Amino acid sequence: MCIRDRIKNKTTSVSGMGIAGEVDSPVPGQFESMEATLNWNTMYSYATKMMNPNKNIQITLRAAMQNDNKNGGYTYKGLRVVLGGRPKELDPGKLKRADTMGSTTTLEVTRYLMEVDGTTVIDIDKFAGRYYVDGEDMRAEINALI
């Protein structure tokens, strides 16, 4: 399985006197639609089970990231990504002799958590209004006012 996802802030265009042109300014804690596409070699039963629109899907992905150290060797860090959301699309792929099917499942991501070596670096929950980067609440000042 291979996964591809992207986090993109909503932006608003700022222009006016004293600004040389326009600036696309991110709106803190607001995100565009986030999708994750899971690529499968074949049509697994759990890929079709994910298409139940009445269930929220949560997937935990783990990896070991290899880094170069200053002595010419390697160090390793653990990576954990948790995705939560609803199914958007299922592409069963193609049937071709002696080839993979290339099936995909696309999710609308509403929950995104990334940890590196057990430390949370990104934590987004669209429905709960959570947005943390390196442990700092990006919405704290806004939430205190509303």
Residue ranges and their predicted role:
Residues 50-84:
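Short, acidic/charged, Gly/Pro-enriched secondary-structure junctions
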Residues 23-44, 99-112:
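Oligomerization/assembly interface segments of phage tail-like spikes and tubes
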Residues 38-46, 63-69, 83-89, 109-114:
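Beta-strand elements of well-folded, non-transmembrane domains
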Residues 24, 47-49, 69-71, 90-97:
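Catalytic micro-motifs at enzyme active sites that drive phosphoryl/nucleotidyl and oxygen chemistry
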Residues 7-32:
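N-terminal interaction modules that seed assembly of large macromolecular complexes
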Residues 28-32, 53-55, 73-77, 97-101:
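A generic structural micro-feature
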Residues 86-146:
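Mixed-charge, glycine-accented linear interaction segment located at domain edges/termini
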Residues 1-3:
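Conserved small/polar residues in nucleotide/adenosyl-binding loops
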